[in-house]
Each structure stands twice: as C-alpha cells, then as structure tokens.
C-alpha cells in the first residue's frame, strides 16, 4: 500500500477539503481517466483496491497511472477507550481529493475495456467519479 517514506510530523489536523482542484485536472499520461466529482478523503486501502480492480479487468494489457498519493496520517483512538488523554496513534494514510482531480489514468486498451475497468475501480472508491477520455486531435 502507498504511504510516505518519512514525514516531518507524525500527526496532522483533520482539516477540511475546500474548493476545487488547482492541479491534476487534465489527462497527462493516458488516454482515459477517472475524475473525482466530489470532495472526500480516500484511504490507501481504497486506492489499492481500485488499482487491483483496474489491473485485473485489463488482464495485464495497457498501463495504469495512479495520480493521487495518500500523504495525510489519520489517527484513531483504540476501541472502548475514554475521551481525553491525548490524540490517538496514526491508524492509516489518506489522500484529500478535491473535485476535478484525476485519480487514475489508463492507456493501451479499447474504449469499452477502459470504461468497464474504470467503472469497477470507481465502485471501490467512496466518491462519485466521472469517466473521461482524451479528445482526439
């Protein structure tokens, strides 16, 4: 699973996801992509599950690019522990996704295969997404 090799601080504020994506809104690598429509935190496990669904459907044909990286540590307190006594330990890593962000790109497959594969990947994610295609020049 994806996670940073090292970070400056162990814990972060929860934060809010405001506005739309500034960068990463265009297809840069592949012919087809999956674009986020709503803001949400996506965990490293969800990204990995979507990647597996993509590659499994494509049957090792084509190429996949993951355009998001989980760099936000999400902390949680153990179950049945009373409130207080400090913030919990980092539990998992997440990526803050803004609307308009390209999450996955694929290339080297047909339009039908790409659409089906990205639909399967989208089912593994907690956000609404849209299938996008590079406009032929």
From Swiss-Prot:
Pfam families: Ribosomal_L16 (PF00252). It comes from the Bacteria. SUPFAM superfamilies: Ribosomal protein L16p/L10e (SSF54686). InterPro entries: Ribosomal_uL16, Ribosomal_uL16_bact-type, Ribosomal_uL16_CS, Ribosomal_uL16_dom, Ribosomal_uL16_sf. Signal peptide: none annotated. The keyword Flavoprotein does not apply. One of its GO terms (cellular component) is cytosolic large ribosomal subunit. One of its GO terms (molecular function) is structural constituent of ribosome. Gene3D superfamilies: Ribosomal protein L10e/L16. Keywords: Ribonucleoprotein, Ribosomal protein, RNA-binding, rRNA-binding, tRNA-binding. Binds 23S rRNA and is also seen to make contacts with the A and possibly P site tRNAs. Belongs to the universal ribosomal protein uL16 family. PANTHER family: 50S/60S RIBOSOMAL PROTEIN L16, LARGE RIBOSOMAL SUBUNIT PROTEIN UL16M. Part of the 50S ribosomal subunit. This is Large ribosomal subunit protein uL16.
